């Protein structure tokens, strides 16, 4: 039987700004099983990142707030947990990889210490134990000369190498859920492919469930088991990756797929555009998106 790791029910997230209340996420439902990859796709501003940040309340201290809904992680509702309990989860049971590896790493801290940090904090490793484990995982993610470069700083690495370090840090404690927020966007195509292959390989080894946020449908086809399509703060369609690609039901999903160029596209071929504009989430339309 498939083990349910995460279940989100009727999630509503809002941001209070001078102009009013931005209803960034409006009634989102989804689930995540052990060892699977769920891709969340949609255009910028559709609510992808806010949805996943809400899981561990990473927008707390900002103007964001969960208005309504359940976030069940192994049966416990994270939406009701206080900050001091969520801190124990972040980096241990639920980890996150962000889009830009340069801003994800502390530029004044040696990369080895950054990978060691969650092990010391969450696993109570000694420094010697943490260093041994950090070297193991840096070698696992394919960082060249990991032992020699353990005391190097982030600026001394390429973009792809920095992202490998970020992945190593996120996976150090073998989390049950890994949230990857457009982790390949800042990389070239060759490096994107390497990072995606690496994530799939590591997922098999530690059986982590992945939520992969992207607007790149090619990446989705490569990595996802299931897909959730977001538009206007709502998940308008979810399904198996083949169902979404070959039998989309929602007009927005169809438009998103149809706007993607293929190998037969030439410079003279007009690309399909979705008419209109995304809904104003200060004044969202009534009903479904």
What residue ranges belong to the model's regions?
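Conserved ABC transporter NBD signature motif
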Residues: 65-77
